[in-house]
Every structure is written in C-alpha cells, then in structure tokens.
Amino acid sequence: MLSASTMKEVVYWSPKKVADWLLENAMPEYCEPLGHFTGQDLINLTQEDFTKPPLCRVSSDNGQRLLDMIETLKMEHHIEAHKNGHANGHLSIGVDIPNPDGSFSIKIKPNGMPNGFRKEMIKIPMPEPERSQYPMEWGKTLLAFLYALSCFVLTTVMISVVHERVPPKEVQPPLPDTFFDHFNRVQWAFSICEINGMILVGLWLFQWLLLKYKSIISRRFFCIVGTLYLYRCITMYVTTLPVPGMHFNCSPKLFGDWEAQVRRIMKLIAGGGLSITGSHNMCGDYLYSGHTVMLTLTYLFIKEYSPRRLWWYHWICWLLSVVGIFCILLAHDHYTVDVVVAYYITTRLFWWYHTMANQQVLKEASQMNLLARVWWYRPFQYFEKNVQGIVPRSYHWPLPWPVVHLSRQVKYSRLVNDT
C-alpha cells in the first residue's frame, strides 16, 4: 500500500510511478497499454476507455478491478487531505448566550447536536473484497499431475505394444536419413543427451521450488507435458518405423505374454524411460522423440519463469538443450524427422498455451477466438479461469528459516518479482 504522503502526489506521478503502482497491486498486464500514462491520466480513466483498444484486449472484466483500485486511490487521497475535519464545511461552533442574571448559559447548538456538529449520512463507495489474482488451487494441480502421470504410463504401455510390431533389422533395414549420411555414429553421444536432460530437469525442479506461484506454473507444466506424451502415443501407434541403425539390440518379443509385458512396463517406468538407467531396451518409439520433448520443454519453462537479467543462465540452459538434441542425432538413435516433429509440436503447444493463459480475452470462447476450437480448450479454461493476467516471475525462500547474507550477516526473507 502506498503511503499517505505519496497519495498527495498522485496527479504528479510519472509513467514509471504508474507502472510501479500497477505492479504493486498485481496488475502487470496493464503496464504495456498504460505505459505512457501519468498519474493524472490514470485517475481520469473511465469505464468507456475499456471498451476501446488497447484496454479492451487486456481485461475480461471490462477493467472493473483496475477502476475499483483507482477509486480506492482517490478516496485515500481525499481522506488524507481532509483528515483533520476542518475542510469539509460541516464544522460549526455553538454560541454562548448570557442569562438575565448576568451568567452565561450552556451553548446553543445551531443544529441541535452536541458540540455544534450536525449529523449527515455520507455514502462512500468501497470496492468489494476480491479473491487473489493468482490463487494456488492445489487441487487442480493434483488433477493436472494425475493427467500427466496417466499419459506417461500410457506411453510406456504403447512402447511395449509397438515394440512387438517393429520389423527385424535384417528384414527391414534403417530408412535413409540425410543427417546419418553426413555424420558417423558416436556411441557415447546418447549418454550425453540423457545427462543434459537430467541436468535441465534438475535445474527446473530447483527453480520451481523457489517460485512463489509454483502451483499455477507446475499445473501448466503437467498439462503441456501430458498432452505432448499423449500425442506421442498416437504417432507411435499409427506409424511404426524400422530401427534407425544396425547397432540396435532390441529385447526379444513376448508374443502375447502379458505378465512379462507388465514387468517390462514397470521396469521402464521405474527407470524414467532412460537408456542410461538400463530400463529402455525396446524399439519402435521413434516418431516422435520423447528426449527432444523434455530437452526443449524444460528449457522453455526455465527461460519463461526466470528473471530476464539472468541471461547467462538462459544461455547455459539453451546450450545444454541444443547439445542434447544434437547428440540424439549423432548417436543415430532417432531419425531426423523424429527430432524435427518433436521440437515443432513442443514449442507450438508451449507458445499457444501461454498466449492463451496471458490474454484474458482468449479465455472466453467466441466466434472470433479460433484458439477455442482446440480439443483441450475446456480443460484449459478449467485450469486457468481464476488466474488473472500474466503470472509474475516472483520468487521466495521456501524454507522456514531466513536466508543469511554472508557479507553482512543480515538475516532476511527474500522476495523477487522480475516481470
């Protein structure tokens, strides 16, 4: 909340001060359309302004929340200016009337009220208490996690099913691939890919623990990664490609032994689907690459929800992702088309989801909103309907004890909000 002295200067606010006030009140989505507004422009905003661009494209509540905050700002300014009670024109003083015996009687009250005041009813409009702009809603996050987990389990089941259909490499040799024509296979390259992937997942998990709005952001991660693996189940099943290299040693086919298939599926789940853990020795899960999905998606989330000033951190994560994807191809463990399709679907789904989540108008189905035609739009509305605006890149210390600053030995609890 702004101080009373600052309230007196609202009309003199600079555009930067207006932007700071918007961020303090958790309304970062207005910073860009109101970027040139001064304090005077801010308090002159009306309902009509929200019916015209650009404000009509920012808010789905017709700017009601911002207008309520501006009304509160005006009232605090007014109350501060008249807090002593002598500038409102309602203070009147009684008159002492002498008695016939020369003494003075009690004061005659001009309005019949004690102390010379008159009673009036003043109606002050106050904004109604509002819910948090970024509610945690852990129940929805749990539902999104179960969705992602179900899609991951379904993917492992599908890998086991497709493995039974892969033709032997002696019968159906690898398909021609331009990358394989120009780069010889490097045996250890796939291990580098999986190590890079584990590093990126670890960095993202650590970053997630420090996020203030971790429930909302993890919900988005689970929704996107679950949908990507669901798509992967479909592409693997409809088209079974031969192994991409003669170096593959696929595990024997089980020919309907469901008990052995269940054990194989559980082993794959326990090992995280990684070859480096010895859990993945099945073939057929080529179109498209799950490793590329994780390398790309973790980088996108790390960059999206970390401060812009940490450019070096973004470059390190980008390098880990690119090297990992290149090593997939260098190991000849996926066709080039597997990697290209995985990258395309992952980036587009991430960008579509976040564009829709950051624009309130896109959360409402209409004839003009063509994005509302995607099959996952209803679940998206359910998960995102209570999130108002762009989620700030806010961080806080998650542990019960404060951080100790070593250079000054000062204890503090840190909260960073970098938008």
UniProtKB/Swiss-Prot annotation:
CDD domains: PAP2_like (cd01610), SAM_SGMS1 (cd09514). One of its GO terms (biological process) is apoptotic process. The modification Phosphoserine is found at S14. The keyword tRNA processing does not apply. Pathway: Sphingolipid metabolism. The keyword Lipoprotein does not apply. The chain crosses the membrane at residues 142-162, 190-210, 221-241, 282-302, 310-330. Its EC number is 2.7.8.27. Residues 331-419 are cytoplasmic. Residues 13-76 form the SAM domain. One of its GO terms (cellular component) is Golgi trans cisterna. Keywords: Apoptosis, Golgi apparatus, Kinase, Lipid metabolism, Membrane, Phosphoprotein, Sphingolipid metabolism, Transferase, Transmembrane, Transmembrane helix. Disulfide bonds: none annotated. Its main location: Golgi. It catalyses: an N-acylsphing-4-enine + a 1,2-diacyl-sn-glycero-3-phosphocholine = a sphingomyelin + a 1,2-diacyl-sn-glycerol; 1-(9Z-octadecenoyl)-2-acyl-sn-3-glycerol + a sphingomyelin = a 1-(9Z-octadecenoyl)-2-acyl-sn-glycero-3-phosphocholine + an N-acylsphing-4-enine; N-hexadecanoylsphinganine + a 1,2-diacyl-sn-glycero-3-phosphocholine = N-hexadecanoyl-sphinganine-1-phosphocholine + a 1,2-diacyl-sn-glycerol; N-hexadecanoyl-(4R)-hydroxysphinganine + a 1,2-diacyl-sn-glycero-3-phosphocholine = N-hexadecanoyl-(4R)-hydroxysphinganine-phosphocholine + a 1,2-diacyl-sn-glycerol. GO terms for molecular function: ceramide cholinephosphotransferase activity; ceramide phosphoethanolamine synthase activity; kinase activity; sphingomyelin synthase activity. It is a multi-pass membrane protein. The active site is at H291, H334, D338. Major sphingomyelin synthase at the Golgi apparatus. Catalyzes the reversible transfer of phosphocholine moiety in sphingomyelin biosynthesis: in the forward reaction transfers phosphocholine head group of phosphatidylcholine (PC) on to ceramide (CER) to form ceramide phosphocholine (sphingomyelin, SM) and diacylglycerol (DAG) as by-product, and in the reverse reaction transfers phosphocholine from SM to DAG to form PC and CER. The direction of the reaction depends on the levels of CER and DAG in Golgi membranes. PANTHER family: PHOSPHATIDYLCHOLINE:CERAMIDE CHOLINEPHOSPHOTRANSFERASE 1, SPHINGOMYELIN SYNTHETASE. Belongs to the sphingomyelin synthase family. This is Phosphatidylcholine:ceramide cholinephosphotransferase 1. It comes from Rattus norvegicus (Rat).
